[in-house]
Amino acid sequence: MAEKFNLQDRFLNILRTNKIPVKVYLVNGFQTKGIIRSFDNFTMLLENGSQQNLIYKHAVSTIMPESFVKLTKQQNEESENEEK
């Protein structure tokens, strides 16, 4: 059976693990920058220097990473999952 693919969690996890700086635009027009340190179903923790912001996901309009994020699985990841 095909594995479920959660785009949002995969995207945020790649940003978090690779420490890719992001710009987060909120629905009220506010913009903040930083690195995603953690996230759950409802919030994400954004860190910028010594400042931390806990942002509710329902308030987020757009997340723009500073570098390209490849969301598809690598060839070796797929073969490892098939072996299990």
Curated annotation (Swiss-Prot):
Keywords linked to the UniProt accession: RNA-binding, Stress response
Keyword RNA-binding assigned: yes
Source species, domain of life: Bacteria
Keyword RNA-binding annotated: yes
InterPro entries: Hfq (IPR005001), LSM_dom_sf (IPR010920), Sm (IPR047575)
Signal sequence extent: none
GO molecular function annotation: RNA binding
GO biological process annotation, one example: regulation of translation, ncRNA-mediated
Record CDD domains: Hfq
GO cellular component: cytosol
Residue stretches in coiled coil: none
Sm domain boundaries: 9-69
Subunit note: Homohexamer.
Entry's family note: Belongs to the Hfq family.
Function recorded in the entry: RNA chaperone that binds small regulatory RNA (sRNAs) and mRNAs to facilitate mRNA translational regulation in response to envelope stress, environmental stress and changes in metabolite concentrations. Also binds with high specificity to tRNAs.
Protein name per UniProt: RNA-binding protein Hfq
